[in-house]
Amino acid sequence: MKAIILAGGHSVRFGKPKAFAEVNGETFYSRVIKTLESTNMFNEIIISTNAQLATQFKYPNVVIDDENHNDKGPLAGIYTIMKQHPEEELFFVVSVDTPMITGKAVSTLYQFLVSHLIENHLDVAAFKEDGRFIPTIAFYSPNALGAITKALHSDNYSFKNIYHELSTDYLDVRDVDAPSYWYKNINYQHDLDALIQKL
């Protein structure tokens, strides 16, 4: 099982690449890597990013998005890594701007997936908040690759586009025993300031 850290966004709203923003002296990407490593669930943790940022990561396992799908958002990152690892059975996807994700959240979602896998033949297990799914904290089966490829060849690169074609189930973020901010995206500097005040 592989983990994909999505870190290829332009971070326009934040003002600088979010992967290198810091919480308590630790970069977002380092923090997410450490959390994923702590679960002992993954045979490989891969950072998915763009050519401009790739050399800035102090981490050996960085993959640049497929050149045919540059600037097509997070689906391009998932697509690129799935194509490179056709034998892999499952991929966990997390956005780099979710620095407070916990190992407990990852393992809880995995247990949810496994418990529903056989009965429901799930392609995707994701979290949801107030009925809205969070596609960038989710497990994806390789079966999702077809729908992702189709979306990338259309003009609609949104996750909603692929979720309609896949067997998907959701776990509520409140089902995880963790601080309420564990799943929050940091989109703006004031989001980071607010998070730091809570810590």
Curated annotation (Swiss-Prot):
Pfam families: NTP_transf_3. It comes from the Bacteria. One of its GO terms (biological process) is Mo-molybdopterin cofactor biosynthetic process. The keyword Cytoplasm applies. It is found in: Cytoplasm. InterPro entries: MobA-like_NTP_Trfase, Molybde_CF_guanTrfase, Nucleotide-diphossugar_trans. Its cofactor is Mg(2+). Keywords: Cytoplasm, GTP-binding, Magnesium, Metal-binding, Molybdenum cofactor biosynthesis, Nucleotide-binding, Transferase. GO terms for cellular component: cytoplasm. Its EC number is 2.7.7.77. GTP binds at residues 6-8, 18, 65, 97. HAMAP family: MobA (MF_00316). Transfers a GMP moiety from GTP to Mo-molybdopterin (Mo-MPT) cofactor (Moco or molybdenum cofactor) to form Mo-molybdopterin guanine dinucleotide (Mo-MGD) cofactor. NCBIfam families: PRK00317.1-3. This is Probable molybdenum cofactor guanylyltransferase. It comes from Staphylococcus aureus (strain JH9). The gene is mobA.
